Amino acid sequence: MAKVVTLGEIMLRLSPPGNQRFLQARDFEINYGGAEANVAVSLAEFGHHSVFLSKIPENAIGDAAISTLRSLNVDCSHIARGGKRLGIYFLENGSSVRPSSVVYDRADSSITKAAPYEFNLDEIFKDADLFHVSGITPVLSEEAKELTLAALKKAKEHHVTVSFDLNYRSNLWTSDIEGKQKMLSEMMEYVDICFGNARDAAKCLGYTEAGIDFIDGEYNICVDEKHMRNVLNHYHFTHLITTLRNSISASDNGWSGAVCTSDDYYKGRDYMLHIVDRVGGGDSFASGFLHGILADMGSRKALEFGLAAAAIKHTIPGDLNYITESEVLSMIESDGAGRVQR
């Protein structure tokens, strides 16, 4: 299998039990997760040598986060230790007409102070096949931006395929929007595989087309073949992949996705999901697609693998997707009815 490197923040997640509100909570359930950490876990479970890069504090909470990753076969040997704290986010799980709610407490977390010299990037990217990062990491701080850029450049020096999930988070875009768009747009020259669509590109990269409002306009335009291909060609991606989510309620979603390449546009299977936990669903989708590409499935089968992996993730509490390749393949071959396997 392939050697995959991911870079990002792993956070402590605290959630009231079940569907309780924050105001009701007297205790919290603990999970660990983060966009790139979630991808690292899934790819390790699919059999790849999965290396996670981050900076994590030298305390019991940091140790617990690393222990969680190691227990799922993620290579943590290149994680830098130090800094003040692990980022925290509080998640209130929604239900029916009440949406989920997230409160972040991540200021001055260790990853925001990480520097390129703390990582032996030449050794890390030696013999690597894929590097994955998201648009979350470089906008966390100036230091995180410099680390991300250094990793992107080093990956390309070693001829490593680069995957980038635009992953827009509004709470990280409250200031210097044009500066952040310019910074991420410049990073796209290193990117081969991009997860996003025209709306994500407009928000994160400042992408525009004459006469079209991708941010506030009709969403279907942002994911149709014409405009997906325009984004693909503008940034010279090999693949542009998007999810297609129809939120019927906080508990029930329609789920699908599409992939665009220079010579193909393919919309995948439609799923109807009853949601246990949707956090990490997009990361499971990305990791499933990447596994498909690494396993030479081709873009269409890779998309279906990603959709099925993410569909299963929506049934699992926590950020991480505890599944195997065989379970995903069984889902693809089934009608998704969830019958008991004996």
Predicted feature locations:
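Conserved phosphate/ATP/ADP-binding segment of small-molecule kinases
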Residues: 172-263
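Alpha-helix C-terminal capping segments
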Residues: 31, 38-49, 292-295
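A short helix->loop->beta-strand "cap" motif at the edges of active sites that frequently abuts
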Residues: 157-161, 235-238
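Short catalytic helix/loop segments, enriched in acidic residues and glycine
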Residues: 21-39
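Positively charged, low-complexity intrinsically disordered leader regions
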Residues: 1-21
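Conserved post-catalytic alpha-helical subdomain immediately downstream of the catalytic base
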Residues: 265-335
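Conserved N-terminal subdomain of the carbohydrate kinase-like
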Residues: 49-136, 328-342
